[in-house]
Amino acid sequence: MADIPARTEMKVTTGPIRGSRKIHVEGPQGVRVAMREIALEPSSGEPPVRVYDCSGPYTDPNAHIDIMAGLPALRRDWILGRGDVEDYEGRAIKPEDNGLKGPDRSGGVTPFPNVVRRPLRAKAGQNVSQMHYARRGIITPEMEYVAIRENVGRAALKEKLLRDGEDFGAAIPDFVTPEFVRDEVARGRAIIPSNINHPESEPMAIGRNFLVKINANIGNSAVASDVAAEVDKMVWSIRWGADTVMDLSTGRNIHDTREWILRNSPVPIGTVPIYQALEKVGGIAEDLTWEIFRDTLIEQAEQGVDYFTIHAGVRLPFIPMTAKRVTGIVSRGGSIMAKWCLAHHRESFLYERFDEICEIMKAYDVAFSLGDGLRPGSIADANDEAQFSELKTLGELTQIAWQHDVQVMIEGPGHVPMHKIKANMDKQLEACGEAPFYTLGPLTTDIAPGYDHITSAIGAAMIGWFGTAMLCYVTPKEHLGLPDRDDVKVGVVTYKLAAHAADLAKGHPAAKLRDDALSRARFEFRWRDQFNLSLDPDTAEQYHDQTLPAEGAKTAHFCSMCGPKFCSMKITQEVRDFAATRNAPADQFIAAGDAEAGMRAMSDVFREKGGEIYLPAAE
């Protein structure tokens, strides 16, 4: 493992996504926002299609990527320019931070080589959270950045905004202004995860009235530990559309793995701090203390973690409610805290010390992701007393965090059949004051190990439509093993699909733009445009070429599904062409009210074509 930097540099994927180029849109205050532009064939006569881009500099051919140096500190000048932070020595890194407790110190990895900066924190009496700024009426560069990002595609539509959907009471604007972003953050309906010690991150918003976001989970375990693979999975996941990444490492080298990821991540990074705290006490939940947990929070905040999953809603009186469940407590963090509560027969230190946790969060602008430690792990346990009791507590904790101007989102289930999904969204909105909801799926059935990315994407699309702000991906390995690089891509693309489907259903103003562009390309047999406009151009072209690999097939007016004689779109075009020869618009011809005349006209077409049922493909 000592050769980790070289291996990491070799494995990270860079370069543009097929058919795309990186562009930057500049705002009035000089904020430059990265986007992806998909060029279409000149024959289409259509302008390029711009899409939201999470991939950072890794897809920019003009960027110099050096994993050992990390990414440029995009936000550092913004952070320092506000004048409310100070640098300080920070806590010393200890062997137990990397799970190297005891005499055996073997198995470590090379630390990130460029950790020379001193961490930042709020000056005494200051609060550096985006919510605090928003509530003071300040529009930060982060808010302006978010507004420009969220408007991608809307300028192209101009006054033809496509508002066709049901948003269930959301307040999605036609055009996102920095003022709108500020107001949503101030109300707690959106968060901008942006730790002041993660200046490499590109600002993004998680909220019901913005585009639905997705999260990808990575991280090593006690069974499989490879820092190079985790850094590569982070870069790979954002290439395909992950808006945030959670490092759920539980084995050795947790601190160093996280440092490599953070310094090279252009998206917010989340963690579950109790995992590392548990490693520090040798995996014995009963030995956890507030002091160890607090030290872990500060350690991770100094590194730059943008949001913490904290299972403060697992209360002692709720634990007996899970006794009759089919699958009990399935959350790792939830089970750890449940065991601690039972061993000490008292409320957890996460719950009792919540105000003190808020003080740490606002000193670094770390957002809460209040964990659903009692989420259902099977559809049999969905929407039960334990789940909703915890949800009510999370709503109470949200109000406490908001008193500190700390950003909050709420984690949700889990395993929920389709007919019970909307109740989860409705109860969360009511209990948690419209704080952003962040759900794992939910999985809509329990019978598909190996296909749980599909069972969960069904639920994810639904709950995203109902109002969930961010969807946590599920890979094909869910319940079976640690996902590899290929699993990560499948999970991300599947969830990008679910999130986009939700945006369409909500009536997001620009969501249909890409769909319509691809549909026109499909009808006009512009194969390369079809590939490039898709969520996964590589796989789309690969599937096409499995049966029609010749270069000429990229211009053919048919595919291998129907062949040249049965292509419905080709036949439709022939009908339109025939209508044009009759000096009538195609829609008028096809929609003619006189059925008899229409049938006679089609009879004429048949005879003019030689009376053959099947026709050869046009040259």
Swiss-Prot record:
Basic and acidic residues bias: start-end ranges: 93-104
Record EC number: 4.1.99.17
Positions of [4Fe-4S] cluster binding: C559, C562, C567
Keywords linked to the UniProt accession: 4Fe-4S, Iron, Iron-sulfur, Lyase, Metal-binding, S-adenosyl-L-methionine, Thiamine biosynthesis, Zinc
GO BP term (any one): thiamine diphosphate biosynthetic process
Gene Ontology cellular component list: cytosol
InterPro entries associated with the record: ThiC, ThiC-associated_dom, ThiC/Bza_core_dom, ThiC/BzaA/B
Cofactors: [4Fe-4S] cluster
Pathway entry: Cofactor biosynthesis; thiamine diphosphate biosynthesis
Reactions catalysed: 5-amino-1-(5-phospho-beta-D-ribosyl)imidazole + S-adenosyl-L-methionine = 4-amino-2-methyl-5-(phosphooxymethyl)pyrimidine + CO + 5'-deoxyadenosine + formate + L-methionine + 3 H(+)
Chain spans, region Disordered: 93-114
EC primary class: lyase
Binding site for Zn(2+): H415, H479
Note on how the cofactor is bound: Binds 1 [4Fe-4S] cluster per subunit. The cluster is coordinated with 3 cysteines and an exchangeable S-adenosyl-L-methionine.
Binding-site residues for substrate, renumbered to this chain: N217, M246, Y275, H311, S331, R332, G333, D372, G373, L374, R375, E411, Y438
Gene Ontology molecular function terms on file: 4 iron, 4 sulfur cluster binding; carbon-carbon lyase activity; zinc ion binding
Function (record text): Catalyzes the synthesis of the hydroxymethylpyrimidine phosphate (HMP-P) moiety of thiamine from aminoimidazole ribotide (AIR) in a radical S-adenosyl-L-methionine (SAM)-dependent reaction.
Protein family per UniProt: Belongs to the ThiC family.
Alphabetical list of PANTHER family matching this protein: PHOSPHOMETHYLPYRIMIDINE SYNTHASE, CHLOROPLASTIC (PTHR30557:SF1), THIAMINE BIOSYNTHESIS PROTEIN THIC (PTHR30557)
Assembly notes: Homodimer.
Protein name per the record: Phosphomethylpyrimidine synthase
Species whose genome carries this gene: Rhizorhabdus wittichii (strain DSM 6014 / CCUG 31198 / JCM 15750 / NBRC 105917 / EY 4224 / RW1)
